[in-house]
């Protein structure tokens, strides 16, 4: 079973359908007991970082996620950004699970970064075109396992311990997106 954290901001229905299409049972929850029983946890998200953190803190999700070390926690789009320490969007702290910060995209290309872009990575699964919609990005770091070139390097997938971030929308990225999501649910793209 996959637990999708329902904190009130997210692309829950599309992500739920994608995970079910991969053959998993899904539960929408904020309950610690459900999360403890899950094989993996997904934190989806669309919207403003500050609003998301306010909702997460109201529902005591931050402490719950900080205590999980034995299964993948996957953040998608805004959910990936929430995994980090701080965001310039609203100047607010994140979940502080992954070192680094979220900053505005600095590119000569139009913002938001909207549409299909090719991932670049040494991992064979992470070399495909995927669908992005965002104006903020994680800073480049040693935790980036795939990036897109948008006049600047945009982290597309990060992994730090059991935390996996996917900046693009795998549920909207066709067959490759589903394969990437499935690999994340199984534990990710690097071996510790």
From Swiss-Prot:
Its EC number is 4.3.2.10, 3.5.1.2. Transmembrane segments: none annotated. Pathway: Amino-acid biosynthesis; L-histidine biosynthesis; L-histidine from 5-phospho-alpha-D-ribose 1-diphosphate: step 5/9. Residues 1-192 form the Glutamine amidotransferase type-1 domain. CDD domains: GATase1_IGP_Synthase (cd01748). The active site is at 77 (nucleophile), 169, 171. Its main location: cytoplasm. It is found in: Cytoplasm. InterPro entries: Class_I_gatase-like, GATASE, Imidazole-glycPsynth_HisH. One of its GO terms (biological process) is L-histidine biosynthetic process. Keywords: Amino-acid biosynthesis, Cytoplasm, Glutamine amidotransferase, Histidine biosynthesis, Hydrolase, Lyase. Pfam families: GATase. One of its GO terms (cellular component) is cytoplasm. GO terms for molecular function: glutaminase activity; imidazoleglycerol-phosphate synthase activity; lyase activity. It catalyses: 5-[(5-phospho-1-deoxy-D-ribulos-1-ylimino)methylamino]-1-(5-phospho-beta-D-ribosyl)imidazole-4-carboxamide + L-glutamine = D-erythro-1-(imidazol-4-yl)glycerol 3-phosphate + 5-amino-1-(5-phospho-beta-D-ribosyl)imidazole-4-carboxamide + L-glutamate + H(+); L-glutamine + H2O = L-glutamate + NH4(+). Heterodimer of HisH and HisF. IGPS catalyzes the conversion of PRFAR and glutamine to IGP, AICAR and glutamate. The HisH subunit catalyzes the hydrolysis of glutamine to glutamate and ammonia as part of the synthesis of IGP and AICAR. The resulting ammonia molecule is channeled to the active site of HisF. This is Imidazole glycerol phosphate synthase subunit HisH. It comes from Staphylococcus epidermidis (strain ATCC 35984 / DSM 28319 / BCRC 17069 / CCUG 31568 / BM 3577 / RP62A). The gene is hisH.
